[in-house]
Amino acid sequence: MVSPRGPARGADPVGNTLRDEGTIDERESFIDATFAAAKGGGEAVGLTKRGKGVKILAIVDRHGLPLSVSTHAANHHEVTLVQLSFDFYMLEAKPEHLIGDRAYDSDGLDDDLKQNGVNMIAPHRSTRKLKTQDGRHLRRYERRWLVERFFAWLQWKRRLLIRWEYYATNFLGFVQLACITMLLKQF
């Protein structure tokens, strides 16, 4: 894991300014991850069935603007990386509702986030024995396309499609620079 004391600190004033203006609304946030191939190898690269790679984990607000972006080795499951992604969160207040796909359906994750005041909403996996939701909160899941659109915007940056950097902090810097350019378009 890359230390959050690096480039993430530069995004804090931008995020807080946009929040004060009402552009960012963190009450309802969406989480997902995407894969970037790492052709050159390097640190924090995980082997998967698709080859060497990096996982880009993002939390976006209800308008599709990034609130947290982090990079991790691709061989880790997304549930184990959610708490680490809050180290890169650029606002003081955490979201009330965090909406994810079926990969985030975990009782342990639900309990951990509930202790921090965050309600995790994810559809149940087909193998789940005990149902914990009745479906009312899943109406928020329909807007999860916002995080997919964010990744589409992010992958327009050719530099981020394939990781050529050896050091993980350099690649994280490019990812966060792309997110800052998205946020600066809101001014």
Provide a role label for each language-model segment.
Residues 1-187:
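Short alpha-helical elements
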